From Swiss-Prot:
Its cofactor is thiamine diphosphate; Mg(2+). One of its GO terms (cellular component) is mitochondrion. The modification Phosphotyrosine is found at Y301. Pfam families: E1_dh. Keywords: Acetylation, Carbohydrate metabolism, Glucose metabolism, Magnesium, Metal-binding, Mitochondrion, Oxidoreductase, Phosphoprotein, Pyruvate, Thiamine pyrophosphate, Transit peptide, Tricarboxylic acid cycle. This is Pyruvate dehydrogenase E1 component subunit alpha, somatic form, mitochondrial. The keyword Cytoplasm does not apply. InterPro entries: DH_E1, PDH_E1_Alpha_Subunit, Pyrv_DH_E1_asu_subgrp-y, THDP-binding. Residues 1-29 form a transit peptide. Heterotetramer of two PDHA1 and two PDHB subunits. The heterotetramer interacts with DLAT, and is part of the multimeric pyruvate dehydrogenase complex that contains multiple copies of pyruvate dehydrogenase (E1), dihydrolipoamide acetyltransferase (DLAT, E2) and lipoamide dehydrogenase (DLD, E3). These subunits are bound to an inner core composed of about 48 DLAT and 12 PDHX molecules. Its main location: mitochondrion. It comes from Mus musculus. Its EC number is 1.2.4.1.
Length: 390
């Protein structure tokens, strides 16, 4: 009897040491999956589009929620570090657009390719890099994903080609990556992203033409967040139907604030490209909460009420959270635990990003040429002047 009482006492003591929320979550029976209706995509030159219902598993839902929260908290931490003058130079944040980067990744394979513009932090994370490598890149430290020399606009990961600072210039490169996929006979696609502000550039239409002519497996994706810097789409474009801009290329207009819509549309587009039909165009209707960059307060060309309305009615994280809680895929307590874990991860990454050393001046020319300096050009050593003083 004494042994039995002692065993019961140990079990109860172990339960008492666990947070009450964890005990509650562990004892609750959750649904394994749930079916949701999603918004129908507008179509251009397509008879059928993505499905209007989709199944979300509990496992995927928790993964998507954690990833979107991580991107959101990472961007808010970057905002804080910038205001503390720890991050310097250009910095473009994507909070509000989390459903785009997470949803696109959910619809493709790790071996597929992605290239985007300068609002790239979220995509760098979803392509597989840890938060500490992203924040360290923002602070210019050696542990950054580009050794601290790329900064906000020039981040890279496996099968992720940046992060490009020239508006629209990544689009022809994306078509070139798709050409390589076809040339090498690989069943891969390239997601080529640009914003509504770049959508009027001539080089994009040239890329459309070559991709269609050669039937390249390229998904052209316009992230329409309504404003190109401080100019609304209505003031910048004769037509704001960006999904029709490819003319002879089929297109989809997608709710970019709903991760499930983005995921299903991406799966559809990827399957279209893999079938050998050529390129397809997607317009993701989304919204950024911050200004264009850190030098833009974001309220001179739009009202605070407009931003708050989007936050209250269309926030991508809240939409996923409500779906999961209401369908018994997760509990509020469980999602709060994820929030706590994400905040700790971000804080740890921020500490690393501020404590990690900066790259020495001698490495300024590294990773530019096939061989690292010092080497002579026309008989002169151009690198001898780059010496650290400490």
């Amino acid at each position: 009897m004494r042994k039995m009482l002692a065993a019961v006492s140990r079990v109860l003591a172990g339960s008492a040491q666990k947070p009450a929320s964890r005990v509650l979550v562990a004892s609750r029976n959750f649904a394994n999956d749930a079916t949701f209706e999603i918004k129908k995509c507008d179509l251009h030159r397509l008879e059928e589009g993505p499905p209007v219902t989709t199944v979300l598993t509990r496992e995927d839902g928790l993964k998507y929620y954690r990833m979107m929260q991580t991107v959101r908290r990472m961007e808010l931490k970057a905002d804080q570090l910038y205001k503390q003058k720890i991050i310097r130079g250009f910095c473009h944040l994507c909070d509000g657009q989390e459903a785009c980067c997470v949803g696109l990744e959910a619809g493709i394979n790790p071996t597929d390719h992605l290239i985007t513009a300068y609002r790239a932090h979220g995509f760098t994370f979803t392509r597989g890099l840890p938060v500490r490598a992203i924040l360290a890149e923002l602070t210019g430290r050696r542990g950054g994903c580009a050794k601290g020399k790329g900064g906000s606009m020039h981040m890279y990961a496996k099968n992720f080609y940046g992060g490009n600072g020239i508006v629209g210039a990544q689009v022809p490169l994306g078509a070139g990556i798709a050409l390589a996929c076809k040339y090498n006979g690989k069943d891969e696609v390239c997601l080529t992203l640009y914003g509504d502000g770049a959508a009027n550039q001539g080089q994009i239409f040239e890329a459309y033409n070559m991709a269609a002519l050669w039937k390249l497996p390229c998904i052209f994706i316009c992230e329409n967040n309504r404003y190109g810097m401080g100019t609304s789409v209505e003031r910048a474009a004769a037509s704001t139907d960006y999904y029709k801009r490819g003319d002879f290329i089929p297109g989809l207009r997608v709710d970019g604030m709903d991760i499930l819509c983005v995921r299903e549309a991406t799966k559809f587009a990827a399957a279209y490209c893999r079938s050998g039909k050529g390129p397809i165009l997607m317009e993701l209707q989304t919204y950024r909460y911050h200004g264009h960059s850190m030098s833009d307060p974001g309220v001179s060309y739009r009202t605070r009420e407009e931003i708050q309305e989007v936050r209250s009615k269309s926030d991508p994280i809240m939409l996923l959270k409500d779906r999961m809680v209401n369908s018994n895929l997760a509990s509020v307590e469980e999602l709060k635990e994820i929030d706590v874990e994400v905040r700790k991860e971000i804080e740890d990454a921020a500490q690393f990003a501020t404590a990690d050393p900066e790259p020495p001046l001698e490495e300024l020319g590294y990773h530019i040429y096939s061989s690292d300096p010092p080497f002579e050009v026309r008989g002169a050593n151009q690198w001898i002047k780059f010496k650290s003083v400490s």
